[in-house]
Every structure is written in structure tokens, then in C-alpha cells.
Swiss-Prot record:
Protein name, UniProt field: Threonine--tRNA ligase catalytic subunit
One of the record's GO cellular component terms: cytoplasm
Gene: thrS-cat
Binding site for Zn(2+): 226, 277, 405
Co-factor: note: Binds 1 zinc ion per subunit.
EC code(s) of this entry: 6.1.1.3
Keyword Nucleotide-binding listed: yes
InterPro entries named in the record: aa-tRNA-synt_IIb, aa-tRNA-synth_II, aa-tRNA-synth_II/BPL/LPL, Anticodon-bd, Anticodon-bd_dom_sf, Thr-tRNA-ligase_IIa, Thr/Ala-tRNA-synth_IIc_edit, ThrRS_anticodon
Length: 540
């Protein structure tokens, strides 16, 4: 079950009809159908009775093991006690055809069920809100990005205003990395397969890799940046005095997601990670992880994600993994020790670590009540072992370093999509592609408006001048709809007095403001990366 604004939902209900055996078509199944089953492709929780009912209905074999029902290679977590929730009000959300394999297809009916009608109505209203603020709609409306048919599926084109947002996010992360002592690097995107075989990606991640042959040699686009950073580490002899060595990169990676799973910027095949890799000694792990956890919490708070809206998880060894039990235990204990010393509560996610090491994940809850997994910190003893990394210790002996993988945004594209939906298209001023729009009341004050435009540009403010023939009220509405944080309205009176009228996106309007006072407050708001419109609040 999922939690939504304090209401417990029986969400994600699915009824799967095997077309191969009974020939049903999607349109033949209506709202009256009550045999709902849980999607076997997700890590969905259901009761033991529900699991048995699901498995009994289906013609395929299954078995219960370690609290999971195994079905056709998929696993569903089973609760020990039957649920007391018996939904009375259902709504069909989607009917589609699903092809899990070439010879099998299903009609999949997605729906939700609630005990009370008002809960169902509340949920449907929430769905409308989610749909309205879909980042794909916002991206098109604000001219941020597109997915033309001529590009490969899952690869976005970022327009001028969308690139501004990306650059601001990267600039902020560059400042964070510099404050933590990172060396920014740049690495290639194509590598010989021998690299991926050494790293283990070829055996454990091949299904998501883009591999191809050129001149009788197998090559691959990088799905992760870590092996490339390892090659930089190996390029010279390292001393214990050099450690920790921290590399950062805005690295473009490619992962071959299934076409049906692609979803705007949230699930793409090519994306930029705010990646970082730290090479260090074992006794440096705890302090480094603690610093990373604290810095991640600080960064997320800049975007308004703090307190109960941040959830920290510890993900342990998955079934498909590399390395010995001893190395996994050491890595997991290092993460646990750091979290405990910080006094941070965390949730253990069994078997959800990376194939090379355990990890700390940060989930955030957005303004629409949804949880998103973002930041990650991973301790890795295995890749240094596989690549035979070394450093010279105090006594002259050669020792194996430990490696920490970290990404705070996760990826620029996904984080940008989450922010667009979280802020509903109205980004904080420092992130907004257009920060100020000047609206002259008439053409008589065009010279004054142009003078203000020049001064704002001199101070690196992203500003536009709207001299269109539309009415002032329409131009104000247009600026508001486009998420412009501030409007400067000027008429004859403002020109004569050398002042401006400032109108905020929050509909606060202040007349007779000295331009220099507004500029000073605006620059301070941008410099501090304030969430709220602090500039106009200071002018009140």
C-alpha cells in the first residue's frame, strides 16, 4: 500500500487477463469487474490471502519463499497478516495491453479502491492536479525541452530556456563540489568491452548497456562514470598522503531502458549525472560518509526538501552482486556506523543495493505528496579489488583503497523534472530562465524601459522586455503563466520619478520603488538562492 496525504490507499490494483487463453479485449472489461490483482512486475506489497488468490487464478507456477511470492521470475512481497481493508469504491484508471514476452500478452486494468467515496473523490482530484503539472506539459508550455520523433527514443533536446535551468543546477553543484575538495574531470563516452567485463557491468548490467561493434571490436556507451574515474586514479602512483582523492563529473551516461518505461525526463536513455567518486583509506570512510550525508541534507534543503519530506534508506546486498560476504559486511557496517553517529533514523531496504556495494539513498516528498528517490552514497570495496587499485602506505607497502560513489541530484534531467512538478512550473528566482519582465504601460516610456533593461543585463539578471500591443493585464497574466518571478511596470509617473512598480509572482505589488533598491534586493535573493520572493518582501 502507498501513503497519500494521510490516507491509506489500495493503489496500483491490476487485473491481468491472459489474451492467449480467453481472447478478452480491453474494451470488454468495464467498471463492474471486481477481480482485481496486483501487478507482478513491481515490488508491490499484498496480503497472503491476496497473493494466494492471485496465484490460484493464474495458470503459471509459483512458490512462496522468504516472504515473497515468486512468479515467472518476478517477486512480490507478501504481508504475513490479511488486510482489514476492504475497498468498496473502485475507479478504473487505465486499460492497456501488456506484452511481457513475445508469446504472452495481457489486458492490464489499473485501478484504485477506497473504503469511503470521499477518499476516492479526493484521490481523483489529486490525479487531475498531478496531470495538470506534468513536467512534459510544463516543458512544452515554457519552451524548455522537446522529444522530436527524429531523435532516438528517450533522448531529450534542451531548448535555450531549459538549458539555463540545467546550467544553474550544475553551477550550484560545482560550488558544492569545490567546497568539498573535488577535482572536476571529463571522461569519454565510449569504451572497449574489456572495461565493462573488468568492472562487472558486462555480467550484471549488460541488459541496460548500449553495445555495438566497430572494426571488429565490441564497444559500449558508458552506463556509469565510475570505471572511467578508476582509470584516472590508475594513471599514476598514489600515496596515502593524497587520499582522499575526490573526482567529480557531469557525466553523460546511456542506459537502454525499455521503450514502454520511458517517461519524459523522469526516465530517459541518455542523461547527465552529478557524479562523484572518492578514493580513500578504510579509516577515512566514516568521516567522509558523514560529511556527504550532511552536505546532501543541506543541498536538498535549498530546494525546500527538509524534515519529514526527506527519508533516508540503507539498501543492502542484492541477489545479483559481486564480491565476498566479508567485503559487503565491511561496507554495510561503515554506512550504518556513519548514520548512527549522526543520529539519523533510516529505513533498511533489503537487497536493493548496487551490484557492487550497499548504499544510502535519499527519498524526497514533493508538493503533490509523491516520494522520489534522489541522492545516493555507496561504499564500494569490490571495484577497487577488481581493478587492483593501490596506494603507497606510510611503511612503503601497497594497500587497496576503498571507493565511494555519490550523486546528490541523481541526474540533472530527472531532478529538473521533479522540480518542475514540485514548483508547478514556477521555479525559484535563481533557477528561473526569465527572472524579470519589464512591462511598459505605453510606448511613450519605451526609452525608460530600455534603460532599465540595460541596467538589469549589466548585473547579469535574465530579463525580457514585453512591448507587445496586448493590454497590460494580458501581459501580466502571460508573465504569471510563464512563471516569471518579477514584473517591473513603468508608466509616465515612474519615468518622471525615476522609480518602478514591482509586481511579484505572488501577486504582491509595490508602487514607487527606487530601482536601485529593487535591484539590490533581487541580487541578494538570487545570491542566497532563496526559495521565496524575498526581494519583494524586503520592499514592503
Amino acid at each position: 500500500m502507498e501513503e497519500y496525504k494521510g490516507v491509506w490507499l489500495k493503489a496500483g490494483i491490476i487485473y491481468a487477463l491472459n489474451l492467449a487463453s480467453n481472447g478478452f479485449k480491453p474494451v470488454e472489461v468495464g467498471l463492474g469487474e471486481r477481480d482485481f490483482y496486483v501487478d507482478v512486475e513491481s515490488d508491490t506489497t499484498l496480503t497472503l490471502d491476496e497473493a494466494k488468490k492471485f496465484a490460484t487464478y493464474n495458470q503459471y507456477s509459483y512458490q512462496l519463499k522468504d516472504g515473497y511470492i515468486e512468479f515467472n521470475g518476478n517477486k512480490i512481497k507478501v504481508l504475513g497478516e490479511p488486510s482489514s481493508l476492504e475497498p468498496k469504491y473502485f475507479e478504473i484508471l487505465n486499460i492497456s495491453v501488456h506484452h511481457p514476452s513475445p508469446n504472452v500478452q495481457y489486458v492490464r486494468i489499473r485501478g484504485v479502491g477506497f473504503e469511503k467515496k470521499e477518499e476516492l473523490d479526493q484521490y481523483l482530484k489529486w490525479l487531475e492536479e498531478v496531470s495538470e503539472y506534468d513536467h512534459r506539459i510544463i516543458g512544452e508550455r515554457l519552451d524548455l525541452f522537446s522529444f522530436p520523433d527524429e531523435t532516438a527514443p528517450g533522448l531529450a533536446l534542451f531548448h535555450y530556456k531549459g538549458q539555463i535551468i540545467r546550467k544553474e543546477l550544475m553551477k550550484f553543484m560545482e560550488e558544492i563540489n569545490e567546497s568539498m575538495g573535488y577535482q572536476e574531470v571529463f571522461t569519454a563516452e565510449i569504451y572497449r568491452s574489456i572495461l565493462w567485463k573488468t568492472s562487472g557491468h558486462y555480467d550484471y548490467y549488460k541488459d541496460k548497456m548500449v553495445l555495438f561493434k566497430m572494426e571488429d571490436e565490441e564497444l559500449g556507451l558508458k552506463p556509469m562514470n565510475c570505471p572511467a574515474h578508476i582509470l584516472i586514479y590508475k594513471s599514476k602512483t598514489r600515496s596515502y598522503k593524497d587520499l582522499p582523492i575526490r573526482f567529480s563529473e557531469f557525466g553523460l551516461v546511456f542506459r537502454w531502458e525499455k521503450r514502454g518505461e520511458l517517461y519524459g525526463l523522469l526516465r530517459v536513455r541518455g542523461f547527465v549525472q552529478d557524479d562523484g567518486h572518492i578514493f580513500l583509506t578504510e579509516d577515512q570512510i566514516k568521516d567522509e560518509v558523514k560529511m556527504l550525508v550532511k552536505k546532501t541534507i543541506d543541498v536538498l534543503s535549498i530546494f525546500g526538501f527538509k524534515g519529514d519530506d526527506v527519508r533516508i534508506n540503507l539498501s543492502t546486498r542484492p541477489d545479483e552482486s559481486i564480491g565476498s560476504d566479508e567485503l559487503w559486511e565491511k561496507a554495510t557496517n561503515a554506512l550504518v556506523s556513519a548514520l548512527n553517529e549522526l543520529g539519523i533514523k533510516y529505513i533498511v531496504k533489503e537487497k536493493e543495493g548496487a551490484f557492487y556495494g550497499p548504499k544510502i539513498d535519499f527519498d524526497i516528498r514533493d508538493s503533490l505528496g509523491r516520494w522520489w528517490q534522489l541522492s545516493t552514497i555507496q561504499v564500494d570495496f569490490n571495484l577497487p579489488e577488481r581493478f587492483k587499485l593501490e596506494y603507497i602506505d606510510k611503511d612503503g607497502s601497497r594497500k587497496r583503497p576503498v571507493m565511494i560513489h555519490r550523486a546528490i541530484y541523481g541526474s540533472i534531467e530527472r531532478f529538473m523534472a521533479i522540480l518542475l512538478e514540485h514548483f508547478r512550473g514556477k521555479l525559484p528566482t535563481w533557477l528561473s530562465p526569465v527572472q524579470v519582465r519589464i512591462l511598459p504601460i505605453s510606448k511613450d516610456v519605451e526609452d525608460y524601459a530600455l534603460n532599465l533593461l540595460s541596467k538589469l543585463k549589466e548585473n547579469k539578471i535574465r530579463v525580457e522586455l514585453d512591448m507587445s500591443d496586448e493590454t497590460l493585464s494580458k501581459r501580466i497574466k502571460k508573465a504569471y503563466d510563464e512563471g516569471v518571478p518579477y514584473m517591473i511596470i513603468v508608466g509616465k509617473k515612474e519615468r518622471e520619478e525615476g522609480k518602478v512598480t514591482v509586481r511579484g509572482r505572488n501577486n504582491v505589488e509595490i508602487r514607487g520603488v527606487k530601482f536601485d533598491d529593487f535591484l539590490k534586493a533581487l541580487l541578494e535573493e538570487i545570491r542566497n538562492r532563496d526559495l521565496n520572493q524575498s526581494a519583494i518582501n524586503k520592499l514592503k
